[in-house]
Amino acid sequence: MMTFQTLDDLDDGQRVLVRLDLNSPVEDGTVQDNRRFDRHAETVKELADRGFEVAVLAHQGRPGRDDFVSLDQHADILADHIDRDVDFVDETYGPQAIHDIADLDSGDVLVLENTRMCDDELPEEDPEVKAQTEFVKTLAGEFDAYINDAYSAAHRSHASLVGFPLVMDAYAGRVMETEYEANTAIAEKEFDGQVTMVVGGTKATDVIDVMTHLDEKVDDFLLGGIAGTVPAAAGHPVGYDIDDANLYDEQWEANSEKIESMLEDHRDQITLAVDLAYEDENDDRAEQAVDDIDEKRLSYLDVGSETLMEYSPIIRESEAVFGEGRAGMFEDERFSVGTAGVLEAIADTDCFSVVGGGDTSRAIEMYGMEEDEFGHVSIAGGAYIRALTRAQLVGVEVLQR
């Protein structure tokens, strides 16, 4: 049940500060258009059409990484999505930014510079600390209201996400509203029939958290091929990381007792891959039965065809299906079989379905599916996991105060 104010509670024509999550892939310095712009455009366009003066906050990448770039390209992409001019200023709360904010007229949209270029944005600290930063105090006085639409970043206690609701009127944008409602449904909704969850990705802690918290709700957990630590607990020596970083070894060492205990307690609810795919000496996709893996010597990058044949009817016969993360390295078409196949099976059903994780919407777009074939497609990653496990989302909590 939502307990925060939404755009329906906001009087038209005010000057508003809107936090979006436009964090995007960057290839050779070029920001890639993606579904996040589609989603957030709904909020921004509604506000502009209602005569609000709109200033946008967003982040991109992390300091020191190749994707840590300015938001000037984001402003251009957003303009295409809302079909109106969007201005950009290369400051977040400096004198030029304040000047441009003061010059906003009804229906104008201004994108401020990358929040993570501000010293006050990082690291994560209590909301009360972030509310007292120069960043928050400077901008708060320039606006009538703050709107958080960045559900996918709601697990982060950063200044632009948690500071403003403590010092000014705060509202949820349309993405925040719909994502929160859909992603909490699994914990609140009751089902009479089979409930299935497809769990992918490479983070053992995410797999553990999801399965531990949802074991009474979910009848069958189907595991993706690169969640390699769980097959290891079942006695199959799978998995080097694709960059030879021994990701599985490190995660196994840190979480082996929890994984073994989880597998022992919930073995009848867990369906493991029966075959896995790897790159052979000719750079082609090859598959191997899990039972035939007797030593750890390969990087397995996807579930195999037999696994997909086993998983698909389980999905299609379910009353509800939830998906989290990838089944394989779908960016490489050779290893897209698992991720694309699972998503196609979910799309083919009429059941209640929610799919999410940081890469899911990208996979849907890459392989020609439409979001309306699913009950809900979450653009969130970490926040989606936390919602499924009923963990605190600090960005939502401050809106509810």
From Swiss-Prot:
What are this entry's molecular-function GO terms?
ADP binding; ATP binding; phosphoglycerate kinase activity
Q: Where in the cell is it found?
A: Cytoplasm
**Pathway entry:** Carbohydrate degradation; glycolysis; pyruvate from D-glyceraldehyde 3-phosphate: step 2/5
Pfam entry (one): PGK
Coiled coil, from the record: none
Instruction: Give me the residues that bind ATP, please.
Output: E331, G357, G358, D359, T360
Q: Give the Enzyme Commission number.
A: 2.7.2.3
One Gene Ontology cellular component: cytosol
Q: Where does substrate bind?
A: D21, L22, N23, R36, H59, Q60, G61, R62, R116, R156
Which domain of life, per UniProt? Archaea
Its UniProt entry gives the catalysed reaction(s) as:
(2R)-3-phosphoglycerate + ATP = (2R)-3-phospho-glyceroyl phosphate + ADP
Provide a GO biological process annotation: gluconeogenesis
SUPFAM superfamilies associated with the record: Phosphoglycerate kinase
- Major localization class: cytoplasm
* InterPro entries attached to this UniProt entry: Phosphoglycerate_kinase, Phosphoglycerate_kinase_CS, Phosphoglycerate_kinase_N, Phosphoglycerate_kinase_sf
Q: Provide the alphabetized UniProt keywords.
A: ATP-binding, Cytoplasm, Glycolysis, Kinase, Nucleotide-binding, Transferase
Q: Which PANTHER family match?
A: PHOSPHOGLYCERATE KINASE (PTHR11406), PHOSPHOGLYCERATE KINASE 1, CHLOROPLASTIC-RELATED (PTHR11406:SF23)
Query: Family, per the entry?
Result: Belongs to the phosphoglycerate kinase family.
The record's HAMAP family line, in alphabetical order, gives:
Phosphoglyc_kinase (MF_00145)
Quote the protein name from its UniProt record: Phosphoglycerate kinase
Organism for this UniProt entry: Haloarcula vallismortis
| Taxonomic path | Archaea, Methanobacteriati, Methanobacteriota, Stenosarchaea group, Halobacteria
